[in-house]
């Protein structure tokens, strides 16, 4: 099975300026992510960036780079530009790996590609089982619901499903359902679908929840969810995250 990994690497970050270039154990963060994608067995790994400093750094460690606009509203829009510019075939499997995930396990990068390859859908993703009630009620931990065939029913920052008879007590609410899933923000797409996705108008649901994947569900597309073989560690969003990752990789 062939698949291409595209790593969006945006220069501007309100909390961590120049984030993809920040040093971790002697390498820029983006290089760690690129190496993980290479280890996953991808046929091709492309770094998509909007800044010449990231382009130069990535080329220096041997990466293929595609320069993109700095006006995109989402990572998916950046993917679509890469697919168009690089003339990637519509049936190619594209895996979107975030540029701030230096600890992403290579096994889940290949897993999400294999998940899409097996399913007759245009989009696939992964989830893990929720393990604490704190995660359940944390809006930054996105919850996922799937049907008996693993097809997504909904994604939300709210605690879903709602345990009606137990919800007054958070502990009981967590115990009442063993079906709580936390979504992992890694996706595989058919390349042609990415172009279709960005052609659709944004929807009220995705804007309300601030979850891009809800656009696909709104327009009637199916998303297959599989349990991840390995739970990834948290990506780098803050200075505290950066210091923790530096300690891990020291």
Curated annotation (Swiss-Prot):
Query: Where does this protein act, in terms of pathway?
Result: Nucleotide-sugar biosynthesis; CMP-3-deoxy-D-manno-octulosonate biosynthesis; CMP-3-deoxy-D-manno-octulosonate from 3-deoxy-D-manno-octulosonate and CTP: step 1/1; Bacterial outer membrane biogenesis; lipopolysaccharide biosynthesis
Q: Which GO terms describe its molecular function?
A: 3-deoxy-manno-octulosonate cytidylyltransferase activity
User: Per its record, how is this protein called by name?
Assistant: 3-deoxy-manno-octulosonate cytidylyltransferase 1
What are the EC numbers? 2.7.7.38
Which reactions are catalysed by this chain?
A: 3-deoxy-alpha-D-manno-oct-2-ulosonate + CTP = CMP-3-deoxy-beta-D-manno-octulosonate + diphosphate
User: What HAMAP family does the database record attribute to this sequence?
Assistant: KdsB (MF_00057)
Q: Which GO terms describe its biological process?
A: CMP-keto-3-deoxy-D-manno-octulosonic acid biosynthetic process; lipopolysaccharide biosynthetic process
- Main EC class the enzyme belongs to: transferase
Matching CDD domains: CMP-KDO-Synthetase
Q: Where in the cell is it found?
A: Cytoplasm
Job of this protein: Activates KDO (a required 8-carbon sugar) for incorporation into bacterial lipopolysaccharide in Gram-negative bacteria.
Taxonomy, top ranks, is:
Bacteria, Pseudomonadati, Pseudomonadota, Gammaproteobacteria, Pasteurellales
Q: What is its main location?
A: cytoplasm
Give me the Gene Ontology terms describing cellular component: cytosol
Q: Which InterPro entries match?
A: Cytidylyl_trans (IPR003329), KdsB (IPR004528), Nucleotide-diphossugar_trans (IPR029044)
Matching NCBIfam families, A to Z? kdsB, PRK05450.1-3, PRK05450.1-5, PRK13368.1
Name the family the entry cites. Belongs to the KdsB family.
* Origin species: Actinobacillus pleuropneumoniae serotype 5b (strain L20)
Name the cystine pairs.
none
Keywords (alphabetical) are: Cytoplasm, Lipopolysaccharide biosynthesis, Nucleotidyltransferase, Transferase
